[in-house]
Amino acid sequence: MGPGKEKFALITGCGDGGIGHALANNFVQNGFIVIATLLPHESRTHLEHAKIHVIDLDVTKEDQMIPFRSTLEEITGGTLDVLVNNAGICYTMTAADTDVKQVEKMFAVNVFGPMRLVHHLHRMLIAAPRGVIVNIGSIGGVCPYVFGASYNATKAALHHWGNTLRVEMKPFGVHVVNIISGEVATNILKSDVRDNRTLPEDSVYAPLAQLFKDHVNRTPDAMSPDDYARGVVAMVQRRSLPAWFWHGNATGFIWTLDSFFPRTIWDWLFTRWFKLENLVGTQG
């Protein structure tokens, strides 16, 4: 991204202490003017900066998109250098015990939100000297992380949609990067804790109820949001951009296993990590 022109970055989901918050700060430190979105009820004092414009946006609401784009065009003059599809929510549960209504909500934010934003903003990215779309994905979209089947599915969908988007936008000079994120110390898991997420009493996984509870309440060994954001912002400004950018704790390990080992390596690992062998013979 060359000098001499104001650069604009739009980041969705910029709640206090999360990846979006850290990205907003780091983009500003690198000379960008940032447009940060929040839900109407969220505090915004953490985003008080002359170069950060805060706009209310629920990425699941189609009727908010046209007014949002108009406001965005007024700020940027009609172009957009970087779109970061960061807004996301999490839901922890076994695949068999999944509440589909919860999953529908998660897909609405994690998958349909990015689709909606690209649909409405792609011309602004094309109009920029070098438009970049960044999708905040996850290692969960690559490996079968136990108790995360539905979240994993949203990220796998985002990755594959992003892959096709990358190919389709290339003729217009717009780059698309999927970030394959490892563990980052954010608030995304707190909704499970707040909702006191537990296994159903009649679940076939009931023998693992305590392990599930401990998993929900865990404190991951995670990269800080600021370290994560610095890596992403530096990557966005490279001359040559990757299709996938693996970033965050455990990504090197996950990449190695996914690249060089049989697919069933995950079965072996996760069965042992989550003590699934303890379920053998408990039904029937």
Swiss-Prot record:
Keywords: NADP, Oxidoreductase. It is an enzyme of class 1 (oxidoreductase). GO terms for cellular component: endoplasmic reticulum; lipid droplet. The keyword NADP applies. Pathway: Polyketide biosynthesis. The active site is at 151 (proton acceptor), 155 (lowers pka of active site tyr). The keyword NADP applies. GO terms for molecular function: acylglycerone-phosphate reductase (NADP+) activity; triacylglycerol lipase activity. Pfam families: adh_short. Induction: Expression is increased in rice-extract medium (REM) and is correlated with the production of pyriculol. Its EC number is 1.1.1.-. It comes from the Eukaryota. NADP(+) binds at residues 11, 37, 58, 86, 151, 155, 184, 186. GO terms for biological process: phosphatidic acid biosynthetic process; triglyceride catabolic process. Short-chain dehydrogenase; part of the gene cluster that mediates the biosynthesis of pyriculol and pyriculariol, two heptaketides that induce lesion formation upon application on rice leaves but are dispensable for pathogenicity. The highly reducing polyketide synthase synthesizes the heptaketide backbone of pyriculol and pyriculariol. Pyriculol and pyriculariol contain several hydroxyl moieties and double bonds, so it can be assumed that several reduction steps occur during biosynthesis. Belongs to the short-chain dehydrogenases/reductases (SDR) family. This is Short-chain dehydrogenase RED1. It comes from Pyricularia oryzae (strain 70-15 / ATCC MYA-4617 / FGSC 8958) (Rice blast fungus).
